[in-house]
Amino acid sequence: MRSQRLAGHLSAAARTIHALSLPIILFWVALTIVVNVVAPQLQSVARTHSVALGPHDAPSLIAMKRIGKDFQQFDSDTTAMVLLEGQEKLGDEAHRFYDVLVTKLSQDTTHVQHIENFWGDPLTAAGSQSADGKAAYVQLNLTGDQGGSQANESVAAVQRIVDSVPPPPGIKAYVTGPGPLGADRVVYGDRSLHTITGISIAVIAIMLFIAYRSLSAALIMLLTVGLELLAVRGIISTFAVNDLMGLSTFTVNVLVALTIAASTDYIIFLVGRYQEARATGQNREAAYYTMFGGTAHVVLASGLTVAGAMYCLGFTRLPYFNTLASPCAIGLVTVMLASLTLAPAIIAVASRFGLFDPKRATTKRRWRRIGTVVVRWPGPVLAATLLIALIGLLALPKYQTNYNERYYIPSAAPSNIGYLASDRHFPQARMEPEVLMVEADHDLRNPTDMLILDRIAKTVFHTPGIARVQSITRPLGAPIDHSSIPFQLGMQSTMTIENLQNLKDRVADLSTLTDQLQRMIDITQRTQELTRQLTDATHDMNAHTRQMRDNANELRDRIADFDDFWRPLRSFTYWERHCFDIPICWSMRSLLNSMDNVDKLTEDLANLTDDTERMDTTQRQLLAQLDPTIATMQTVKDLAQTLTSAFSGLVTQMEDMTRNATVMGRTFDAANNDDSFYLPPEAFQNPDFQRGLKLFLSPDGTCARFVITHRGDPASAEGISHIDPIMQAADEAVKGTPLQAASIYLAGTSSTYKDIHEGTLYDVMIAVVASLCLIFIIMLGITRSVVASAVIVGTVALSLGSAFGLSVLIWQHILHMPLHWLVLPMAIIVMLAVGSDYNLLLIARFQEEIGAGLKTGMIRAMAGTGRVVTIAGLVFAFTMGSMVASDLRVVGQIGTTIMIGLLFDTLVVRSYMTPALATLLGRWFWWPRRVDRLARQPQVLGPRRTTALSAERAALLQ
């Protein structure tokens, strides 16, 4: 009953399409014209409505935007580098050119949010200049998230600014980095789309002409495919230009390739069944109904499978994948509808003129032989196909992916040229650093937190695979000069060293003092001897003076007696007026007057005697003081000698100690040893250090960032493996410190690809499970057999693994080009979507032919579908393979991997593996359906295999 109802619906649809073939064709032509007029070309829309490909909920993107917010610098994840390269060392001209560039870039606030001007600051200039001095760079944070149209516009604006400033002779400027790399990917992806489309059309035209040997048939089929492609492009452009969906380079390339391949496949299904019916003797109209009844449900199921599988990508989180969901699903539904309406209408019109009539008798002998071999020896055939599949499966364990986009865009791309220039002077990872931020709840601008920040930098730096860490405590990647405790201790002895010679001079003065004291002692002892002699002389003189005094007193007494007797005579000399004139008188007067001085003389002698007595006493006392004076001086001399000896040894020890401390400090400083970092409080007042604080600490001082450079390629599996150890090292560094509650963020190339890697695993799992479930449900609805549906799904899964393994073998081991990380998920998703088509067509035909018996039905099914499916599979495969002409190597890898999968599915799985499995399972292949009931059902989905029936009866049986 179900088959009869389906046949009735298909017959009604076939009659309607046949009757309204011209209006249907005109409707599709009008629709194509309208959607292509109201919306720009797909490539233009993709450029202006390109979505950011980074996962918005990824920790790395959250971290990048948090860093920009806390430092009040940017709110996007797009970074670019402007690289200066000179033939000689960069000098003043290069700096002036650089300053002009930075000034112009800073004026473009629309596209440039922040400039990390390291080279413009002498404090950090060495950190952004190459070791040979011939290259330097400035990092820019641009508007828009990476991969989005706004970010690409920002990159273009930066490139225009750089191009507008003429460089000095011998100096070149390059715009490179992750942002420009993503922009170049869009440019070259769009540029290659016309090439891919042209090659696809050429391949399809050649294969169609070879298959059908009819130029008119091939041209009509190509026109149908072209009309469907234009319709899909216009519809998707209309949706995108009205912001109903986002696009990306990969979306456009995959969409165009799938549209061309699917529309070609479906029209091959239709034309193949039409020609088969004509070959059995049916007239053109009957062949049309046979074609529609035998393929419409297959096209419908295939279209729903492919579109549904692509729409399952909407459950994924990565924009790389979820941007494929709506465009590809809508595009493939459009192809399916066109293949069920436009293509039959064109065939109906063209068949009236015999344009699709077979030009030669088609032979099924080859496919009958293959079918016979399969049903006769299903076990060996299955074993042989498994061995072929094993070739690819064995290559899977050696699979190595690569995340570096540089290797998958043309080397002539501007960003790639910049990367190559950077590689000539810098380590490979310099253009793609990681940024670690520690966010605390207090101001970090103090010596205590500086110790912890340096501990974080040191711990991260000592993580395997890390080449350099720049932070406030090591702005050039090494600890700040003279910041080790041994050096600072050595510097504390600098004053001692400076005073050491003075100390030596004073010790020499002490020695001189000792000598002078000895000399003074000698002089004093000599003085003592002289004083003793003087004392003796004074004592004798005192005795003589007393004797002289006594004699003078006696003389005075005698003269007094004389004066008493001669007083009258004396008076006479005074009375005589003319005494002066009388010599004897005057002489007597003078003599008598002189005797008056004897009294005075005796008084003076008495006084002199008193003085000599005092002098004699004092002299003896002075002599008595010289002995203790000499003893004291001797003691002072002995003390001076002791001090000289002691200080001489002390100075020697101090010299040795300061020399060792200085050597130790210089050694630690020269070795850049970071085991004993310390910044004294006065360092925070240093103007240079304050500039460093502005670079590495947020304006409020609560956040500190670290610029981390990998030792190898950050966009690799090895680079990704560094992320967890970096986070663990930072977490361990703050454990037990005042910053143990701080939040730690990490952003950059490796952390982004780590998030993409983890997101890819999740997304692929979701997409694969959802697609397999969807395929199984659709296959179950068509075949109504759990086992048959499971076989189709199982062979698709096996085909995926083997095809991808063969791609690994070809690209990685033969061409020595590791597969891009995007190849695996993209290829799996697309091959899941299209891999069941040919098995579905075979099983559907087997279901029609099962009335002749299981084995005979299989032979007939293979004979009836072999040629058509092979042509369709080859066309689909080579259409996807034409993506290898893309300038983006990743697109070529995706296309060739899908091509290998389709070739394997067409030539091995559909031709041998699935028939062998169906034969081995026998009746169980159709479980839970019963084969006897299936055989008794009227075969309404295909023509009767007899020429005895009239064409009209055969048409009614379809």
From Swiss-Prot:
Subcellular location: Cell membrane
Chief location category: membrane
Transmembrane segments: 19-39, 192-212, 216-236, 252-272, 295-315, 329-349, 377-397, 762-782, 791-811, 814-834, 868-888, 906-927
Superkingdom assignment: Bacteria
Keywords, in A-Z order: Cell membrane, Membrane, Transmembrane, Transmembrane helix, Transport
Keyword Membrane annotated: yes
SUPFAM superfamilies assigned to the protein according to its UniProt record, in alphabetical order: Multidrug efflux transporter AcrB transmembrane domain (SSF82866)
A Pfam family: MMPL
Protein's UniProt name: Probable transport protein MmpL1
Native species: Mycobacterium tuberculosis (strain ATCC 25618 / H37Rv)
Lineage: Bacteria, Bacillati, Actinomycetota, Actinomycetes, Mycobacteriales
Name of the encoding gene: mmpL1
